[in-house]
Amino acid sequence: MERFLRKYNISGDYANATRSILAISPQWTCSHLKRNCLFNGMCAKQNFERAMIAATDAEEPIKAIRLIELAKEAMYDRETVWLQCFKSFSQPYEEDIEGKIKRCGAQLLEDYRKSGMMEEAVKQSALINSERVRLDDSLSAIPYIYVPIKEGQIVNPTFISRYRQIAYYFYNPDAADDWIDPNLFGVRGQHHQIKREVERQINTCPYTGYKGGIFQVMYLPIQLINFLRMDDFARHFNRYASMAIQQYLRVGYLEEIRYVQQLFGKVPSGEFPLHQMMLMRRDFPTRDRNIVEARVKRSGDENWQSWLLPMVLVREGLDQQEKWEWLLEYMDRKHICQLCYLKHSKQIQTCSVIDVRASELIGCSPFRTVKIEEHVGNEPIFKTKLIRDQQIGRIGDHYYTTSCYTGAEALVTTAIHIHRWIRGCGIWNDEGWQEGVFMLGRVLLRWELTKAQRSALLRLFCFVCYGYAPRAYGTVPDWNNLGSFLDIILKGPELSEDEDERAYATMFEMVRCIITLCYAERVHFAGFTAPACESGEVINLAARMSQMWMEY
């Protein structure tokens, strides 16, 4: 291969196309209809290596150039390329898969440093607790920021606690007759008094040890208190509470409109659209007057999802009033997956997804109608059927497929998904890196990308494998800010032509190995067992990474 490319001075996209076709040629299915595939009496697409060797040995540059043009032309039909790649990669043969993945991992580790990703990781603030909570906007704790009142006074508390700078004010929801904005003048004084009193009585956060002041209050149903003693429940609920406070703090600023559109899909006219959406009277089939009351008067269970507001179903209700019943039924029955509920209980195969960030970056519509696929864990991600321009996404613990019409759209959509759901802390550490590599492989093979976009894709590959790997002193980089993450990925340095060729070859090989690895349970062959993190060359990778951190 390298001899052929160097002999005829092939580089850039032509070299990438040649490498790709060579890898999948043995399993290529060709109809021979155009007849342009015939080369010395054989199909060059199905026998690309033989044709390449024949052209090289015969010193026939014209035929060699024709082969390269054939490879480049074949890559134009990206859907066929993806199908042929998937067919080829899922038919494993005896090879050293482990060794190849290790070599790709070592190369990506070097690229992690050279691409600037490691330098950016050093700049990120440190996280001591590596157990990252994955948040998305399909669930919200915003109903709990509203003040419960009875005859003009805040309902008396039954218990108080805190999470960092947030006071937790527990009360009986049945004792309240209304819920109002905490900034209204009539309750502002009482609201501030609650903050001072919680800070005085509970000096230290019981969850984190934080000893600073109290700046916000969340009003929580008393039924929630026992569940917050469960570590996993508290970790997730507290993070959603923190996210709700951050959104509430944008009320009155320009960002409020953006948040409201992301959460609800529409922005009402007038002041304070967030409060309007939450407190506006709705035509519920029950006595509940607004979304806040509907949520806080319904208890959840030991699943933290059952206590949050299901925003996918809220948007369904906003679109069609008769679907408010779905929202109430979902909360009454304490469901925890909205897409499972739509697919299995309501026989709905599609739902709406809103992505304001992608819309701002690439100019596409923020509104998407997506197809609901399988729940995470039911089927491996690589078994999801992808046709035409579809890419995989995720709401909570449920996959969906969505259409991406350009390479830029596919790249940004996948980057946002990876930032939210993939926690790259080294190859073989968990299944997340395989899921991430599979999704990036779909982007690499299905869409035509520019060199700048492939440069961004390489940084995503590095992040998927090493983005959350521990730094020199055991801390992990804090990548929680999506805006900063996308700036680093999309606005980083562009690869040179030689670097682009090498990066493409590494990414292509990693994708090929991962798809082959995904079929391990079906087809067993030598060299297929993935090693444990503590063994062999994986330790060497960790040692090399540790040494690289020490250089910064």
From Swiss-Prot:
Superkingdom assignment: Viruses
InterPro entries, A to Z: Orbi_NS1
Similarity-based family: Belongs to the orbivirus non-structural protein NS1 family.
Name of this protein: Non-structural protein NS1
Organism of provenance: Bluetongue virus 1 (isolate Australia)
Taxon lineage: Viruses, Riboviria, Orthornavirae, Duplornaviricota, Resentoviricetes
